[in-house]
Amino acid sequence: MEFVTLGTAGGPVPLKHRAQPAHAVIYGKRTILVDCGDGAMGQLMRAGIDFRHVNEIIISHHHFDHIGGLYNCLGINMMLQRKSPLKIYGPPGTSEIIRGLMESCNVPRATGFGIPGQTLPHPNEFVEVYDLLPEHTLNFDDLRISFCENTHYRVEEDFGKPGPISLSMRFDTETRSIVYTGDTGPCEKLEQFSYFADLLVAPLMDAEKIMHKVRTKNPHMSEERLNMMAKHMAKHFLTAGQLGDLANVSKVGHVVAVHIPLDYINQKTVPDYIKQISLKFSGKVTIAEDLDRF
């Protein structure tokens, strides 16, 4: 089983050298797209993966940087006359999003290629969509995928209550375990969920540096708005030290940091962030680039 980091950026701001969040889990002949940020179809092709061979997509949560490529995915498969099922999974609300995107395909489908009598399949003919809860599991041959809620949206005390949820996911085979946390803050449930995983893929955030840049670039932003953003950055993501703590407590083998916003993590600063993680975790640490394979 292999994990490919298709897009390692984070947040809504496009970056020059990192694509929006999307990854691929490859097991045998099966390729599962995990999150589908803007540009995911192109990143698949750059990784040598034919997007037409992707039959499953799993979404961790519904922030735009993780779902911005879904419409393109539907449209390209429609234009290329897809016939095989495309199954899309995600937290509650996923089916509503996909239904809306499929409805918006009506006009481009009717337009087609401008050839009289020519027809295209509608995405509702090949797309199957399923809303997931943390207790659900997916099984594809001997690949088992399990889920747990994380703290990207709310504190653990609110787990199980009505409201939006953000999911982490674990991929288990007989020989390897991979945990993709998606976006999350510190979370005890996630620590337990990640026990003894061979690979832990998780976000890396430096809230202080991000907020400094936000204030510099937006001098007229209200203090209320700035405080709201600062709270989101601090509570709903992981710092280098917190990522090290998660990896240490979970006893994982290898940490891969993704979801890197702005440009403060670069070739010059990567060693420092690896050092911060390694102060808490003695295993292997990698800060991923697009198209890395693990």
Model-derived features with residue positions:
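Cap/insert and terminal regions of metallo-dependent hydrolase folds
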Residues: 166, 175-179, 185-284, 288-289
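Binuclear metal-dependent hydrolase catalytic cores
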Residues: 1-179, 185, 192, 267-294
